[in-house]
Design a protein with these regions (language model features):
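Alpha-helical transmembrane segments of multi-pass small-molecule/ion transporters
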Residues: 1-292
Length: 292
């Protein structure tokens, strides 16, 4: 995955991808690739055990998200951009590929609810907090989120046992397979757009990264140890997606709302680079504590 990051960096630095081009790729990920990842994860045979595990993963995922939001508020309540950036991980762009790499594509089933909830909260509460305008906290805004829609569609497919024909599953799987390389290429472009010297010499960014990459994952592991042994794989999935770096959407929202997008990009980039060290450590710790 690190190689894809380098490719994105080089493509931008050599002018083969522009800033507008990277925005288009990010939209492709959000509106097409990630929804296909979610829908594909629900194209499996229904079972009562699977239904219970899905409910557990959504409930536990909601708890983990609330934990992250509470921790970020505690540390950064006077800095809305830092608070929202730290609260919401890059669960879609980095979490999904990591879950697939570590546990297999089937495990994305357990991450889908978390990622959809995260995006819904980021889309509504996140933008409201950043802008100071509560107009973003509306049901209509939630229902326009592509990941929420794909989760709802996936739940209907799964519980109603709707067969998805092969001619749809094949292209859906192919598009879903683009997630890891495309997401990391986009992150590489973000990195290339940033002044690396400014990133590494700004102490505030290290504080943000420490909370996002160390404090929150450690608390997540402690809380998920309460899950029964039979549900530890669900715990592993949630640890992976909640140990991911600061979500890149914070940069998109900052730019859209006319805020300091360079600050947002810097926090995304430094936390992404540092996560190459912290993620293996957190996964190793989780494995040592009995997670799958």
């Amino acid at each position: 995955m690190f190689l894809y990051l380098i490719i994105g960096y080089v493509l931008y630095r050599t002018g083969l991808i522009t800033q507008e081009g990277s925005k288009a790729l990010a939209h492709l990920l959000l509106y097409c690739v990630l929804p296909c990842v979610v829908l594909k994860s629900f194209c499996i045979e229904y079972s009562a055990k699977g239904a219970v595990e899905l409910a557990v993963s959504i409930a536990a995922g909601a708890g983990v998200l609330l934990l992250s939001m509470a921790v970020s508020w505690l540390f950064f309540r006077k800095d809305p951009m830092a608070q929202i950036g730290v609260a919401f991980s890059n669960a879609g762009f980095m979490g999904f590929p990591l879950v697939t790499a570590v546990l297999g594509g089937e495990a994305v089933f357990y991450a889908a609810g978390f990622v959809a909830l995260l995006n819904a909260l980021q889309w509504t509460y996140g933008q409201a907090k950043l802008s100071g305008d509560k107009k973003y906290i509306q049901l209509g805004a939630v229902l326009k989120n592509p990941l929420v829609l794909s989760l709802l569609g996936g739940v209907v497919i799964y519980f109603c046992r709707i067969p998805v024909p092969q001619f749809l599953r094949t292209p859906m799987g192919a598009i879903a397979g683009m997630n890891a390389p495309l997401a990391m290429i986009v992150l590489g472009v973000y990195l290339a757009r940033t002044d690396l010297k400014a990133i590494f010499t700004r102490p505030r960014l290290y504080a943000l990264s420490a909370v996002r990459l160390v404090v929150i994952p450690l608390l997540t592991i402690v809380c998920l140890m309460l899950l029964p042994a039979g549900w530890r794989q669900i715990g592993t999935v949630l640890i992976i997606v909640n140990a991911a770096p600061i979500g890149s959407n914070i940069a998109v929202y900052a730019q859209r709302l006319g805020l300091d997008s360079s600050y947002a990009v810097q926090m995304v980039c430094l936390s992404t680079l540092l996560s190459l060290i912290t993620l293996p450590v957190m996964l190793g710790l989780a494995a040592a504590l009995g997670f799958a």
